[in-house]
Amino acid sequence: MAENKEEDVKLGANKFRETQPLGTAAQTDKDYKEPPPAPLFEPGELSSWSFYRAGIAEFMATFLFLYITILTVMGLKRSDSLCSSVGIQGVAWAFGGMIFALVYCTAGISGGHINPAVTFGLFLARKLSLTRAVFYMVMQCLGAICGAGVVKGFMVGPYQRLGGGANVVNPGYTKGDGLGAEIIGTFVLVYTVFSATDAKRNARDSHVPILAPLPIGFAVFLVHLATIPITGTGINPARSLGAAIIYNDEHAWNDHWIFWVGPMIGAALAAIYHQIIIRAMPFHRS
């Protein structure tokens, strides 16, 4: 009888491998199918309420983003010294924290883009249709204009005197410096978005979708810490456009192209790097 029990224990112990593979090798049993690319045009979207609901979510998120962040910037510039205000770190936390909160709130509705550069990068990767991408960008820009407009309504005089939170290339830097900072900063952000929302990672690790807003917000925080002294940190064309339109100063408009060209190039490079180098999508066999 004892021998039979010992044999049962041995059989039970040998049912499983002594060591489990780490990383992606441990997930080979899970069936993963690459989602099909989004169509370039999807006319059916225009008759769907979820399409317009997503656009409204992007508008509201970008509105709140500009409202909180531009108010924070105004508070910093209004202070007599950095010690009596939130400082650059506080401004960076305001931008990163709002992205964290707003991506968390809107990810299940619109994907939580809140940024035309993010939308552009995801469009290049065929994650959404051209119809949806254009609609998102328009709603993001409108939300940003309204958000900055509300801030100006609260402080009309100080808003113009303190620069309106508009992005410009700061003294001591060239336009090339500003463009480079915007390209690299947006690359960091959009690459983080791709990595944090990767469908293959989501299939392997169930916690990834819940945690996605955290690295995205943290990336925004770090980029602001690095590039506020150079350009005030754009990396979001809607944010730059909203502040520029409401501030409406010649200096802001002279530099404004940098805050569209730079982020779009950075987003395109991030999409190419993630899709071709990291995921090797062109080499996948159907």
UniProtKB/Swiss-Prot annotation:
Segments on the Cytoplasmic side according to the record's topology features: 1-55, 111-133, 197-209, 279-286
Motif interval(s): NPA 2: 236-238
Membrane topology, from the record: Multi-pass membrane protein
Family matches, as InterPro entries: Aquaporin-like, Aquaporin_transptr, MIP, MIP_CS
PROSITE patterns: MIP
UniProt topological domain (Extracellular) ranges: 77-89, 155-175, 231-257
Subcellular locations according to the entry: Cell membrane
UniProtKB keywords: Cell membrane, Membrane, Repeat, Stress response, Transmembrane, Transmembrane helix, Transport
Induction: By water stress.
Pfam families in the cross-refs: MIP
Motif NPA 1, residue range(s) on this chain: 115-117
Expression (tissue specificity): Roots, ripening fruit and senescing leaves.
Transmembrane segments: 56-76, 90-110, 134-154, 176-196, 210-230, 258-278
Biased composition (Basic and acidic residues): 7-18
UniProt free text on domains: Aquaporins contain two tandem repeats each containing three membrane-spanning domains and a pore-forming loop with the signature motif Asn-Pro-Ala (NPA).
NCBIfam families the record matches: MIP
Family to which this protein belongs: Belongs to the MIP/aquaporin (TC 1.A.8) family. PIP (TC 1.A.8.11) subfamily.
UniProt name for this protein: Probable aquaporin PIP-type pTOM75
Gene source species: Solanum lycopersicum
Organism placement in taxonomy: Eukaryota, Viridiplantae, Streptophyta, Embryophyta, Tracheophyta
